[in-house]
Amino acid sequence: MVIGLIGAGNMGSALARGLGEPLLVVDAERSRAESLARELGGEAPDSTAELCERADVVVLAHKPAQLDEVAAGLRARPRAVASILGATSVAALERAYPDLPVYRFMPNVAVEARRGVLCYAPGTRAGDGPERELLALFGRVGAVIELDEPLIEPATALMGCAPAFYALVVETLVDAGVHHGLPADRAGLMASEAMAGTAALLTEHRLEASALRRRVTSPGGSTERGLAALERAGMRAALSDAVDAVVEVGR
């Protein structure tokens, strides 16, 4: 299956690198498309129209405001259109591509490391397209979770922004470690590896988050004291407010 990528920005590039195979790439900045295509052993066609003539599936990763403009430039019909555009509904995609099966995906940046999460809502004609092949392809870069479309926005707030939220936690832990005398590079390694190990326990060992927290927390111990400080500082409320703020933007 030949994949054509329209848009080589942060998320489009992350997805392409995670897939790790030659793609056809176009972008408003041709040099950016050429650079990504060269990195992956793919090609940068001269136009969107040429890309669509050669691609089986077109992945939309351009700016959402360009949806109608890009759709108007298609002369050939790919087998399907997969969108990773933010705040762009299935209905909007089907208006732009009225004769094609469309699929709405919302990935997070961890797809680049093949540990991403991709929420997914199929269009009304999805069954007419290469849905199984597409899900298998995207499943190579992370967990693909089908949702009713109204849940895509809150899911994006949870998993799409989560890498930045978690990175802020690591950043804060590193700063605290440095404050207490640890070298920054070693503090960074310890904090990031501790987070990676925690994620492995939650996903690979199927532990509930609350169960893991209780398992690490000994009565009267240092972890209990640290958690109490986090509760006093309002960590739960802060994270909940962050998700609420992102969901509000998407409405």
Segment roles from a protein language model:
Residues 192-251:
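NAD(P)-dependent Rossmann-like dehydrogenase/reductase catalytic/cofactor-binding core
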Residues 1-57, 96, 115, 178-180:
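NAD(P)+-binding Rossmann beta1-loop-alpha1 motif at the extreme N-terminus of oxidoreductases
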Residues 22, 55, 78, 141-142:
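Short, well-ordered alpha-helix to beta-strand connector turns
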